[in-house]
Amino acid sequence: MKKYILSLDQGTTSSRAILFNKKGEIVHSAQKEFTQHFPKPGWVEHNAQEIWGSILAVIATCLSEADVKPEQIAGIGITNQRETAVVWDKTTGKPIYNAIVWQSRQTAEICDELKEKGYGEMVREKTGLLIDAYFSGTKVKWILDNVEGAREKAENGDLLFGTIDTWLVWKLSGGKAHVTDYSNASRTLMFNIHDLQWDDELLDMLTVPKSMLPEVRPSSEVYGETIDYHFFGQNVPIAGVAGDQQAALFGQACFGEGMAKNTYGTGCFMLMNTGEKAVASEHGLLTTIAWGIDGKVNYALEGSIFVAGSAIQWLRDGMRMFKDASESEVYASRVESTDGVYVVPAFVGLGTPYWDSEVRGAMFGVTRGTTKEHFIRATLESLAYQTKDVLCAMEADSGIELKTLRVDGGAVKNNFLMKFQSDILDVPVERPVINETTALGAAYLAGLAVGYWKNQDEIKEQWHMDKRFEPTMEAETSEELYAGWKKAIEATKAFK
């Protein structure tokens, strides 16, 4: 009987189930979107029960459409939108409030208070993160402080907390496994990434009882099995878990120290594997856990760019410059350069390395001769410049010079952007055959745990390149262009 690995990719706007075979190829996939809730400006929430329902739906659709029987699944891997926090009742299994999403700013005031109390340095040292509404810890505190009776129940040990991976493993296992992996734990603001424990000092700071927290386990391990009721009568091992960006790093086979990937989605997330050492950042990067496997923990440096693919959507929907995102490449290629135009797409502030939430988008260098083509090209180029900002920070922090950059995500189909990215970085850019690297990473982690794949060397062999973009731009030209970008950033920051 042919066996497969089922990867569950629980994202910010949709849930997907993807079946992979022994060669790491996609056999079939199913996707279902779910509701976004915006109760107040800047707040973003999800219904955790609806997410669970969407997961069950995509599993059923994927297996039936692929004509694969449940007993053909060798293991399940889970990858998830990180930081999003769920708190539920241990007895009823029902969430006591909506899941507060990573994008949500509803805990900004809590963060300001913690910063004012001088906790910033301690948090940075222990977690590798900044005090920010982005991470799970303040979201849990907010739920306990704002939902009636929640704090008392939590103190009595009646509530459980989890990021989305934890919630799904708990549901699939029928409440038997309350676990998370190192990569997800490292995004909570409650986990010490050096001694690999929930940290009492951090928990006291956030007033979160330890009894709520899941057990932290390696990213590739059997955590439990599906209960018959949720998996068509089968007990399938749930065997791999990693946060979405870390899963993509694993799916890109970036196993060596100094290897890096950049995911071009709504935003961009660039991760560099720093091996078994946690590199503290002096340049606005986050230090995070990549994965834990075979008794070892790998660390990574991470840079976040808030606006990437969403800038292309803005050109399409907001500015109505084209009907399909793929047309952006055609327009951008019609002109030799932007003619000195720079677009800084700081629609929601700037991420790494600036961390400035007050700035807004801007455009510079416009003349009477500026056309739609120049404008589109400048917007695409901004993605490459922002990536260079992150890479410069990574090389400065790690002391490692990047040899090649592996890329994935929706915008990598844009050949113009990938070539310009290579030119601006002066580094080859490699696009893989399989772009679904996040789901693939979770599948690999699960497959290794159940012996479906032997080891990481076997996985490395499966990574195949679709196209390699080599830098051909003169160093002087790329330096000049990048200097113009830095000037545009400074001018943008001055206008508030």
Curated annotation (Swiss-Prot):
Phosphohistidine modified-residue sites: H230
Activity regulation as described: Activated by phosphorylation and inhibited by fructose 1,6-bisphosphate (FBP).
InterPro entries, per the entry: ATPase_NBD, Carb_kinase_FGGY, Carb_kinase_FGGY_CS, FGGY_C, FGGY_N, Glycerol_kin
GO process terms (BP): glycerol catabolic process; glycerol metabolic process; glycerol-3-phosphate metabolic process
Residues binding sn-glycerol 3-phosphate: T12, R82, E83, Y134, D244
Assigned keywords, A-Z: ATP-binding, Glycerol metabolism, Kinase, Nucleotide-binding, Phosphoprotein, Transferase
Family from the record: Belongs to the FGGY kinase family.
Function: Key enzyme in the regulation of glycerol uptake and metabolism. Catalyzes the phosphorylation of glycerol to yield sn-glycerol 3-phosphate.
Subunit structure: Homotetramer and homodimer (in equilibrium).
Protein name: Glycerol kinase
Lineage: Bacteria, Bacillati, Bacillota, Bacilli, Bacillales
